[in-house]
Amino acid sequence: MFDGEDLKKIFAMDGFLRNIEFEVSYISEGSIEIKVPLKENLMRVGDIMNGGAIMAISDAIGGLTVMTYGSVINQVTVNFNTEFIRPIGTGPVIFRSSMVRIGKNIAYVDVAAIDGNGQLCSKSMGTYYIYR
């Protein structure tokens, strides 16, 4: 079973993601939640979280959600859409994923980003190709 240590190892191997601090809240088949502190490397002008960082973390968590299924070896993003609802200015930011549907070759995952005040700030939907 894919666990929090596996998630940390994958982040550490990635040239971009290795610079993002996070704490794993939970991992189960089809669902992941992490908490990300708002650090300077994630912020933009206006003292809010950078939209690209929100999308990158959301995409990473979406893809890793696919890998919580035992038969999955790897995955790649086919499509990824994000709706920014409100700016994120307080942390920690919770990124919460949930599997919508997993098939033989394609998986669909929803990811929400919730600010430190408990407000939904972005919603993403990722489509991932599965390697088994």
From Swiss-Prot:
Its EC number is 3.1.2.-. Coiled coil: none annotated. It holds the Pfam family 4HBT. CDD domains: PaaI_thioesterase (cd03443). It comes from the Archaea. It is an enzyme of class 3 (hydrolase). Keywords: Hydrolase. Gene3D superfamilies: Hotdog Thioesterase (3.10.129.10). One of its GO terms (molecular function) is fatty acyl-CoA hydrolase activity. Belongs to the thioesterase PaaI family. This is Putative esterase Ta0293. It comes from Thermoplasma acidophilum (strain ATCC 25905 / DSM 1728 / JCM 9062 / NBRC 15155 / AMRC-C165). The lineage of its organism: Archaea, Methanobacteriati, Thermoplasmatota, Thermoplasmata, Thermoplasmatales.
